[in-house]
C-alpha cells in the first residue's frame, strides 16, 4: 500500500506500529482518498478537464467511485475545477485552431462539459468565414483541380465548418465549385 506523508502523519504511523482491523480499514480508506486526490491534482495540472471527465478518468485509473467523487468535490471546493472556465478554455483553443462551430461543440462533448455551459461558452464564437478563406488561400494550389478542391473542402468539413460557410467562402474567392460540391 502506497501512503502519502499526510496519511502517515494523520494516523501517527511509525515503523513497527501495530494496527487493529478497524484502524487498518480506516487507513485503507484514507489512503484510497488521498491517492484519488493526488491523481486528480496531476490530471488537472496536465490538462483542462470537466468534473465528469475527471471523475471518469479517476475511476478508469483504478480509484473507487466514492474516492473519485470525493476527490472531484475536494478539487471543486478548492476552486481548482470549474466546468464553466474549462468550457471557455476549450472554445478559445478551438477558435485559435480555426475550428468551426461543430468541431467546438464536439470538443465540449468529448470533455464531458455539461450542456448548461455550452451556450455561454459558444455565445461569442466568431464567424469563421475569414478562417475558411485563409485556409482556402493557403491551399489555393490544390483548388486548381477538382480532386484537390474536394480534398480541401473535406478538410474544412472535418475541421467543423458548415457546408454553407465553405460555399460562401468559395463564392467570395470567386471559385466555382458547383460541380464538385454536388458529388
Locations of regions flagged by a protein language model:
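An alpha-helical, amphipathic repeat domain used for nucleic-acid recognition
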Residues: 1-183
